[in-house]
């Protein structure tokens, strides 16, 4: 740029201008400061599997090398970038946060004039979010009747107080999470190579609700429905009444609903 400089000398009459001249100043090259999605300010929230834009905010005709660092993973996004570049954070990065829904990372930019690096490497932070629908996947729920009587009549119904079902359902977590618990109507099911099983009885309805929770705390639910039949087990009341206090004989009365 240009600057006007004045030179003064002192006399008994005060400071008097002596000479005025113009200097041409050399422009100092500065490294570019990156930002995400907006510029010059940074908008750090991005989603795995969704493209974002990384702005260079350059001050001269420079090119740039853009890199990322997330957890123990790092890599080059692009080289020779002039103004901006697009980056889709791979979902494979999510194996760095198996127990969290977000994680922090860094975008780094090296600035070049030709092959000469300008200044220090500049960076900006980002917060990586899970994609939508990252909850556990619940497969087909299988209900197998264990009571011989119900099974003989119709194994695909639930009979109050009698039915006992073996519940079996495949469940899997997404994006490097692990399954923490799987329940059916509040009863914890056991894991057998990704298929969760358990026995459910004493039902008051025909709905079998599966709830799966992963290591990130994300939940999903699904349910199987069966026709439900109310049923009360038969019972009787019996009373024996002597004919007299000394009699060896009496009357037995038996009653019960059916």
Per-range role (PLM):
Residues 26-51, 131-160, 228-249:
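Short, compositionally biased P/S/T/A/G/V-rich stretches that sit at domain boundaries
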Residues 76-85, 186-194:
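Short beta-strand segments within Ig-like beta-sandwich modules, predominantly Fibronectin type-III
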Residues 17-24, 116-129, 218-228:
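Edge beta-strands of extracellular beta-sandwich domains
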Residues 1, 91-105, 118, 197-206:
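Surface-exposed, short loops/turns at beta-strand junctions within beta-sandwich domains
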């Amino acid at each position: 740029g240009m600057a006007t400089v004045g030179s003064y000398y002192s006399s008994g009459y005060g400071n008097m201008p002596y000479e005025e001249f113009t200097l041409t100043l050399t422009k100092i090259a500065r490294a570019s400061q990156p930002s995400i999605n907006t510029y010059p300010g940074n908008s750090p929230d991005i989603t795995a599997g969704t493209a974002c834009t990384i702005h260079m905010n350059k001050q001269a005709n420079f090119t740039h090398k853009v890199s990322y660092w997330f957890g123990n993973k790092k890599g080059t996004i692009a080289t020779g970038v002039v103004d901006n570049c697009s980056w889709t954070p791979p979902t494979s990065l999510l194996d760095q946060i198996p127990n969290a829904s977000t994680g922090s990372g860094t975008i780094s930019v090296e600035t070049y004039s030709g092959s000469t690096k300008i200044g220090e490497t500049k960076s900006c932070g980002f917060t990586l979010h899970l994609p939508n629908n990252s909850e556990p996947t619940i497969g087909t729920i299988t209900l197998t009747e264990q009571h011989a009587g119900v099974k003989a009549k119709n194994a695909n119904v639930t009979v109050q107080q009698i039915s006992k079902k073996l519940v079996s359902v495949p469940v899997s977590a997404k994006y490097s999470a692990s399954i923490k618990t799987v329940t059916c109507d509040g009863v914890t099911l056991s894991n057998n190579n990704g298929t969760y099983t358990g026995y459910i009885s004493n039902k008051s309805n025909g709905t079998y609700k599966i709830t799966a929770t992963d290591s990130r705390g994300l939940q999903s639910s699904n349910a199987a429905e069966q026709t439900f039949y109310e049923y009360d087990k038969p019972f009787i009341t019996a009373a024996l009444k002597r004919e007299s206090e000394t009699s060896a004989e009496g009357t037995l009365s038996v009653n019960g609903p059916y």
